[in-house]
């Protein structure tokens, strides 16, 4: 019986077709329009930065990959459909109840749509997915050799880094394409009658059999290739219960042979499948496929499991020894922990120290950091904010400069940025928000070893940082009293100013100056941006594009935008670096520095791999998490790596946004590959100026990854490694408010790398014994230009108290707890413990230092800024405690120990001005034992004092005597009261006629 006539589809009128086309056009515009606008804006932005080649290279690469992958997958699927259609049976028996006949008629009526539309849709999807792998493809095209061969196959590591990922990608796409072609061919033959399921056995046409078995055979061949590549991936895979990343005993002696056996079986099965092309019997290929499946279960899974349970587990330490050695070597290479970088030295950790030995460690004791950058931000806000819209981040940064005497000091530094989210009332108006309040103003630095005066009570004047300020002053001139001269303190780019939903500012001269700049006693002064950065928006096309980009009609109608106007956007320094170098992973810490009289943000960039043979696979998020990262929500991306290099140092100019990339690691093959992909974008290391090199620091995230790996991979013996008996732990932060690991600390101290008493800027961390609270090691990474990147590990053999035990001993000391109880006034005042520093001093000793802060009231109100109230120390089992570093050192080691910490300058006046910042900050005092006040001149015999002045002088002398007596007795409350009496008496003396 023949087929029923096909029901005709109703024809569309011309008007209907036009309406459908318009609707499709609107939908396409809504879908593609925003992407086209973003692409055009990015083209403008990259061009303004001078990195348009990056944009064009990425765009062209993505497009070419999209095109090739789409054509490959879509073409194979189309071929499967086309061949099935061309070889369809001429006559297909059918009846009125045949459901396939309806589908056949529908497909034939829309043959072009189905035969072309389906492959195109699949090709588009495949291309969209494939273009996201442009990084892998560019590395394949430009990757080179590492100069290191893997220990199993003898291949250069460049094969694993650059070639193997591409081969895997290509194989995956071929497998998907052939599988989809098989499905399409199968359905086409079924619809067109090449496959019929009627009757007891059904029927299969010759052409259908040939095409389907050919596609199945190709799939089996691709599986054989996959088995071959699996061999290489064994060297970087992880398996439960295995102590290392990479191939272990079972992998090499069972899994690896199994892969070769399975590959051979797959080739035999492929031949069996292809045999069905000439033989009508399909039982042979079916048997072959079943054999392959059973072999994968028995040979691929069963045999390795038997070897693991019977041979390896009873003798695991010996069996895995060779492969653990491979992992130790590879992990050290991959994470920059080889012997030419890391130096191990024995260190007792509990040696006795004399006062003279401690005093001789001037580089350490004169630089003991009292300012905790996670605590003192409210003090910066209190004294240096100036206006409600200026802002300091909750966590400040640490950098180093030479002080006025040429000594290396570390400073707590911050940029006074504008925070658009703190604008209020009329300040939030679009014109004010984006054209008036456009920039921050000022670089603030506080010597980390210094506070202004001594506070024995949170309500007293003292205990706050000394502020060195670079700022536009009240007369419009740049006040440059900071640690280095600065020509332009205005800040248009930074992490705070960009942290808003509408991150842009419109600048440029259009009539009178309109950007808020500073205030005099009588008026507000405005400013006009003159930097090179910014995208011009003077023409109507640009205004229209940005109106669409930010969904803001004021771009079109506001008269504040003129022919010279420019727009600054994407102002976050780290995001700018990630945009121009999309192959970099940036450090979570961005810090400001003055370099050659310019204010710049410095960002560390990493190149990474996730398939370095035998190197441990590490999660950046978990490895870099510490109490600061958790508290301030600055966790690194959840990215797994087995190779990392701090290959790039980047700077972003805070005024004009210029991004500069410098090569830091000249040996990194990954960086070399990317420098070929994007030639001219990364400057050679030789272009790093000496001024910039002085502010480059060893990056925190890299150090945290390395210290976590050193906890295991400092072990040389594989048997000891397997037993974990000599492993270390990263200590938990002992602060009761913390909930994660103790962060590493930047300090200026004696030079651990050179093992001498010169001053060195370094990043340090204590390490505990495995699952214990005793110290195992002390790690220091040098940031000095001459020894940059050298890591020194002081291994500590005895039972030396770790950070938690030291903190417990300090906080529970009766004298400490009693004194802080008085200061806290039954929790009316808030006591906060600062960072617990671990400092090598003397000839083999370790000094713990923990500053204590107090703020009035128990709240976190901005006005309740913390003041340094005490300094607590511990050396061996002895506690030192006092208002100053010198007092605490003297309590520990005796008189003279704090000689280097007595650089006291007279403090004149009270607190620094809060708004605007003081143009000339008053001298500060490094806490010592002397009262932090300016003593009146002692009259000689030729000077006659008035009776009132003479009486006040006696009060001063009495207060000094009381302070000395209280200090000798260790009466800190009495000492503080005497200092307050002295302060009041001196003020009274100066005001007495």
Swiss-Prot record:
The chain crosses the membrane at residues 18-38, 63-83, 113-133, 175-195, 210-230, 254-274, 287-307. It is found in: Cell membrane. Residues 903-941 are annotated as: Disordered. Its main location: membrane. Residues 929-939 have a biased composition (Pro residues). The keyword 4Fe-4S does not apply. It is a multi-pass membrane protein. GO terms for cellular component: extracellular region; plasma membrane. Keywords: Cell membrane, Membrane, Transmembrane, Transmembrane helix. InterPro entries: UPF0182 (IPR005372). NCBIfam families: PRK00068.1, PRK12438.1. Belongs to the UPF0182 family. This is UPF0182 protein MAP_3291c. It comes from Mycolicibacterium paratuberculosis (strain ATCC BAA-968 / K-10) (Mycobacterium paratuberculosis).
């Amino acid at each position: 019986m023949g087929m029923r006539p096909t029901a005709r589809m109703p024809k569309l009128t011309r008007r209907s077709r036009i309406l459908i086309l318009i609707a499709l056009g609107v939908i396409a515009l809504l879908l593609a329009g925003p992407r086209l606008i973003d692409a055009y804006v990015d083209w403008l932005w990259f061009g303004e930065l001078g990195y348009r080649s990056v944009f064009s290279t990425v765009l062209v690469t993505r497009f070419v990959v999209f095109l090739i992958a789409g054509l490959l997958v879509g073409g194979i699927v189309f071929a499967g459909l086309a061949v099935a259609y061309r070889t369809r049976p001429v006559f297909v028996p059918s009846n009125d109840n045949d459901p396939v006949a309806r589908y056949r008629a529908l497909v034939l009526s829309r043959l072009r749509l189905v035969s072309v539309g389906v492959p195109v849709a699949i090709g588009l999807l495949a291309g969209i997915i494939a273009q996201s792998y442009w990084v892998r493809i560019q590395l394949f095209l430009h990757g080179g050799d590492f100069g290191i061969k893997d220990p199993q196959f003898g291949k250069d590591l460049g094969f694993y880094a650059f070639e193997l990922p591409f081969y895997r990608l290509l194989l995956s796409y071929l497998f998907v394409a052939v599988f989809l072609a098989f499905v399409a061919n199968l359905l086409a033959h079924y619809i067109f009658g090449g496959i019929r399921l009627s009757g007891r056995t059904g029927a299969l046409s010759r052409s259908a059999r040939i095409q389907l078995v050919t596609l199945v055979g190709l799939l089996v061949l691709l599986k054989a290739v996959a088995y071959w590549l699996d061999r290489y991936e064994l060297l970087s895979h992880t398996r439960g219960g295995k102590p290392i990343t990479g191939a272990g005993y079972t992998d090499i002696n069972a899994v690896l042979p199994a892969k070769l056996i399975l590959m051979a079986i797959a080739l035999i099965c492929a031949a069996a499948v292809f045999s069905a092309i000439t033989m009508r019997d399909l039982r042979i290929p079916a048997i072959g496929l079943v054999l392959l499946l059973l072999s994968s279960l028995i040979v691929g899974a069963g045999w390795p499991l038997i070897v693991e349970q019977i041979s390896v587990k009873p003798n695991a330490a010996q069996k895995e020894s060779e492969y653990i050695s491979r992992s130790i070597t590879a992990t050290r290479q991959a994470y920059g922990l080889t012997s030419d970088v890391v130096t191990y030295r024995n260190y007792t950790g509990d040696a006795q120290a004399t006062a003279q030995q401690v005093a001789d460690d001037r580089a350490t004791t004169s630089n003991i950091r009292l300012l905790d950058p996670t605590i003192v931000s409210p003090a910066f806000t209190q004294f240096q904010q100036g206006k409600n819209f200026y802002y300091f981040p909750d966590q400040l940064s640490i950098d180093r400069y030479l002080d006025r005497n040429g000594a290396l000091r570390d400073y707590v530094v911050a940029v006074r940025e504008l925070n658009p989210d703190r604008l209020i009332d009329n300040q939030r108006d679009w014109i004010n928000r984006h054209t008036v309040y456009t920039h921050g103003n000022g670089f603030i630095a506080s010597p980390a070893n210094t506070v202004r005066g001594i506070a024995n009570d949170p309500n007293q004047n003292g205990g706050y940082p000394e502020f060195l300020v670079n700022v536009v002053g009240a007369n419009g001139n740049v006040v440059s009293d900071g640690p280095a001269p600065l020509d332009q303190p205005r800040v248009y780019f930074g992490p705070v100013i960009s942290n808003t939903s509408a991150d842009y500012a419109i600048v440029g001269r259009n009539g009178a100056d309109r950007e808020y700049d500073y205030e005099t006693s009588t008026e507000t002064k405005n400013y006009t941006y003159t930097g090179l950065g910014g995208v011009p928006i003077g023409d109507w096309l640009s205004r229209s594009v940005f109106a669409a980009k930010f969904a803001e009609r004021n771009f079109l109608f506001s008269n504040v935008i003129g022919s010279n106007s420019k727009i600054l956007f994407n102002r976050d320094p780290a995001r700018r670096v990630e945009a121009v170098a999309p192959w970099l992973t940036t450090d979570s810490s961005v810090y400001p520095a003055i370099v050659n009289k310019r204010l710049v943000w410095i960002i560390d960039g990493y190149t990474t791999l996730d398939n370095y043979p035998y190197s441990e696979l590490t999660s950046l998020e978990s490895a870099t998490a510490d109490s600061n990262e958790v508290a301030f929500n600055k966790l690194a991306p959840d990215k797994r790596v087995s190779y990392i290099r701090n290959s790039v140092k980047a700077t972003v100019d805070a005024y004009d946004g210029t991004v500069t990339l410098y090569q830091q690691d000249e040996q990194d093959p990954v960086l070399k590959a990317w420098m070929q992909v994007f030639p001219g974008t990364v400057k050679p290391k030789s272009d790093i100026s000496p001024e910039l090199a002085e502010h480059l620091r060893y990056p925190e995230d890299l150090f945290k990854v390395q210290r976590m790996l050193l906890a295991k991979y400092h072990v040389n013996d594989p048997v000891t490694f397997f037993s974990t008996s000599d492993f270390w732990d990263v200590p938990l932060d002992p602060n009761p408010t913390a909930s994660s690991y103790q962060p590493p600390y930047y300090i200026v101290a004696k030079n651990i790398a050179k093992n001498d008493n010169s001053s060195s800027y370094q990043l340090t961390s204590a390490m505990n014994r495995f699952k214990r609270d005793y110290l195992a090691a002390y790690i220091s990474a040098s940031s000095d230009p001459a020894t940059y990147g050298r890591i020194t590990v002081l291994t500590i053999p005895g039972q030396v108290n770790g950070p938690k035990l030291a903190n417990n001993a300090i906080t529970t000391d009766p004298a400490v707890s009693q004194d802080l109880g008085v200061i806290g006034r039954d929790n009316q005042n808030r006591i906060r413990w600062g960072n617990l520093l671990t400092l090598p001093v003397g000839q083999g000793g370790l000094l713990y230092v923990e500053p204590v802060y107090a703020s009035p009231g128990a709240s976190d109100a901005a006005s309740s800024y913390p003041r340094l109230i005490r300094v607590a120390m511990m050396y061996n089992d002895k506690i030192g405690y006092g208002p100053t570093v010198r007092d605490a050192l003297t309590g520990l080691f005796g008189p003279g120990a704090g000689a280097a910490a007595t650089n006291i300058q007279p403090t004149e006046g009270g607190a620094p001005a809060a708004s605007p910042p003081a143009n000339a900050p008053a001298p500060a005092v490094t806490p010592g034992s002397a009262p932090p006040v300016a003593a009146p001149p002692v009259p000689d015999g030729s000077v006659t004092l008035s009776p009132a002045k003479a009486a006040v002088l006696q009060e001063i002398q009495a207060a000094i005597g009381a302070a000395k007596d209280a200090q000798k007795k260790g009466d800190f409350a009495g000492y503080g009261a005497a200092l307050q009496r002295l302060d009041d008496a001196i003020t009274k003396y100066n005001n007495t006629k």
